[in-house]
């Protein structure tokens, strides 16, 4: 909860600074002189409310959504020795990481993958694919679980949702400023909001949304390195490197995890060049090298 309050306070501070800065540079006067009557402070608050609403709602229902979209079956009473081992391993890693025992589940997928989600580090879900359990060694599975526990302990799900809320706010804000500018200044519309406003706003939201996604995905890639470090601390550097190397061997397999969950998996696929800027995970080679340098 403290993390949420700090991010909300930070966002409100940024909103205030942005509003004051635009006013100091005469943006309000420029827009008013061209027939655009905008209350930037009110617009920023409006965008902040709606920008955060979606990301926070997604965060609070993330466990439910993950179970529904991946078909994850929660292990409440272990029926096999593999399930018993999985529960015991997660409990051990959680205790070492200083968090409460998360829910543990298995989802039906051939590819080797795992994810962690939940609105609170003490109310989380950790799930692994059937393929990972079948083909990875116990040490490799333990390292993958340690990586996911690292995400939970670091509060990555909350932080990522709040970062998304911040960028949502400014995408909405600047898209509407651009829409008003095009409608009032370029098309000289003097009666309400014309079609140019809506078209320009939609186009601006699409373009700014792509740029904002690059920011969010950059942060997501940073958190993967941190989770790898946490996994190395909990399971050992050699085991963490071994798990990532095994994932690299299987990288050609299609990832069937829903798009909404790929950012939370340990294996995010492979893309290079400009497309790499929109990837939630850094290349496995970079992650392995970072762990080797860490020693």
Swiss-Prot record:
Regions that span the bilayer: 4-24, 41-61, 158-178, 199-219
Compartment(s) of residence: Cell inner membrane
Cofactor: Zn(2+)
Gene Ontology CC entries for this record: plasma membrane
Annotated CDD domains: M48B_HtpX_like
Keyword Cell inner membrane: yes
InterPro entries per the UniProt record, alphabetical: HtpX_protease (IPR050083), Pept_M48_protease_HtpX (IPR022919), Peptidase_M48 (IPR001915)
E.C. code: 3.4.24.-
Top EC class, one word: hydrolase
Record: residues binding Zn(2+): 147, 151, 224
Gene3D superfamilies membership: Metalloproteases ('zincins'), catalytic domain
Main subcellular location of this protein, as a coarse class: membrane
Presence of the UniProt keyword Translocase in the record: no
Pfam name, any one: Peptidase_M48
Protein name: Protease HtpX
Annotated organism of origin: Pseudomonas putida (strain ATCC 47054 / DSM 6125 / CFBP 8728 / NCIMB 11950 / KT2440)
